[in-house]
Every structure is written in C-alpha cells, then in structure tokens.
Amino acid sequence: ALNTAKLYGAKKVLFVTKLKAISSILKDFEAIQKPFDMYCINYESLHKCESDFDLIILDESHCLGQYPQPAERVKELKRICTDKPIIYLSGTPTPESYSQFYHQFYISSFSPFAEKKFYEWHKNYGIPALKFLYNRQINDYSKTKKEAVLEKVQHLILSYTQEEAGFTSF
C-alpha cells in the first residue's frame, strides 16, 4: 500500500490501522525512504484527525463492516474520506457476511453502491431472513445475494495468496 501511495504521487497520506501495527508500518515507511508525508493513527483516535489528506489507507478494513448501523469509526472515516481515494487492506474483507462490504464502501464518495442507507442496500442485495436471539425473533441481515454483491465490487478487489504476498509458513 505504501508503494502504491508512492506510485500514485501522494503528498500527504493518512494510514489507519490497529494500534499494535503502527510501529511495523512506520518501519516499512522508513524503508521506502519517506516519499510523502504520512500520518499513522489507530482507529480509536480518528476523532483527532483532520481531513486534509490526499490519500487514505485503511488497514484491517473488515473492522468497518458492522451492520445494520455504522460504527462510530465509520462515521468519522466518512467525514475524513469524502472525495478522497482510499486503499482498503484486509486479509478477510467479509469474514462473516457479504453485508460487511456495505459500510466499508459507505465511507467512500466513490462507493460502488448507490444506496445511502444499509436498509436500502439490503432491499437490493439482501435475502430476507429471521433468526432467534435470546428467545426473540429478529431480522437477520447477514444473508445476501452473493453474486450481485460481487458483481458490484469485484473490479475493486485484488486478491493474493499468502505466498504471492511474500508470507512464508513456519
């Protein structure tokens, strides 16, 4: 992602990640000889962030996929990311359901989905279902029309195996 930012010609990059990953990212940034200004922050500190970046990198972006309501960090990112290019990084972009794509892309002005609210999105891409939770019947928003969702997002996704990405097994 850092090399992509360099190739893009970014001048000021916001890199959002988990707290424990910040030191590793800063080390990688040193290795590419700091070709741009970078602000590396964890998701819990987004409220301190301005929106004057020309590129946003979101590590572990699957953590933005809560539904049906957006998490506070998603609302903060929507404010920061308006009209900005975003690079999403995740080993598991939809660990539980394709519904998790909605809020990941919701923060982008360039979302492949036209729907402004999750419930509108689910009417088009979801499969109505119910589930029981604590002896109560509630809507289950995890069921989706997988092919329809993938048709919208597939052109935005690059997939690599661990081996292709340079990771080795022990």
What are the residue ranges of the model-derived segments?
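Conserved Walker A/P-loop ATP-binding site and its immediately adjacent core
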Residues: 2-3, 8-29, 96-100
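Catalytic P-loop NTPase motifs of RecA-like helicase/translocase cores
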Residues: 63-68, 95-96
